[in-house]
A protein has these predicted regions:
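Exposed, polar/acidic Ser/Thr-rich sequence context and nearby capping/turn residues
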Residues: 1-254
Length: 254
């Protein structure tokens, strides 16, 4: 949903018609309130919408809901994964003081990158208290990766930081990574991809040997690495790791 704010500074006004221009592919229609208008040739027209804009600096917020086409494999004739679409308000006809006027703004909503599904990535642990000395094979922290209900995702690389040695990462209880020696900033890499089913969540637990050189207990935990180093794909792509998507556009990566 994109929200447009319209202000009328010289008395109240009525928005009669609105026109939006759609760049890119994938937009089927826009909806304002209970009115839905289709995209025809990259243009969406709302005629006779008659929205009242009060006088003053607060104006009127207009939520515009966008319906996108499904993302499918290239040979299925749908919208390609990673297609980018932008919706721009390009014409406003309004009435104020008995006079009807048409203006041509260019107010674009944020561009949207379309995918078949997407992951939610979280660090869910709060750390573990380690006594002075060496503790071996202790569970240090936990991360989760969940696939959206709309489709499977493929995980290629999960970046994280941890202060430990002989690190083992378990996915839902099964070993998937073993790192001998000291590990700090590192990643669990799945060269052929780790598939997560639609609506499912995989828990990644990080174990390792921890040396606390102090005289008191200290808290140790894992942290997520840079979202730019998180590698994934929707199943539509089936891409190798070198061309996978990153986590920079994910709505939840924390």
């Amino acid at each position: 949903v994109a929200t447009y704010n319209v202000v009328s500074t010289n008395g109240a006004a009525t928005l009669n018609d609105l026109t939006f221009t759609v760049a890119g592919s994938g937009v089927e229609s826009l909806t304002i309130g209970s009115v839905t208008a289709p995209s025809v040739g990259g243009t969406v027209n709302f005629y006779g919408i008659n929205l009242s804009v009060p006088a003053g600096s607060s104006g009127l917020n207009i939520p515009v809901a966008v319906k996108y086409s499904a993302v499918t494999a290239a040979n299925q004739g749908g919208v390609a994964s990673d297609s980018v679409s932008t919706t721009t308000l390009t014409s406003v006809k309004y009435t104020a003081g008995g006079t009807q006027t048409t203006i041509s703004p260019s107010v674009a909503a944020n561009p949207m990158t379309l995918v078949a599904s997407l992951p939610t990535v979280k660090k869910t642990s709060t750390g573990v208290s380690i006594n002075s000395g060496t503790t071996t094979n202790v569970k240090i922290g936990t991360m989760t990766v969940a696939a959206d209900a709309k489709g499977d995702v493929i995980l290629f690389q999960l970046p994280y930081s941890v202060s430990a040695s002989n690190v083992i990462v378990k996915a839902n209880g099964t070993d998937v990574t073993q790192i001998s020696g000291v590990a700090s900033a590192t990643s669990t890499v799945f060269s052929t991809g780790y598939r997560i089913g639609a609506g499912n969540t995989v828990t990644f637990d990080v174990y390792g040997d921890v040396v606390n050189g102090g005289s008191n207990s200290s808290n140790y935990d894992v942290s997520l690495g840079s979202s730019a180093n998180f590698k994934w794909s929707d199943v539509v792509d089936s891409l190798p790791i070198g061309s996978a998507k990153t986590g920079t556009l994910l709505t939840t990566y924390n």
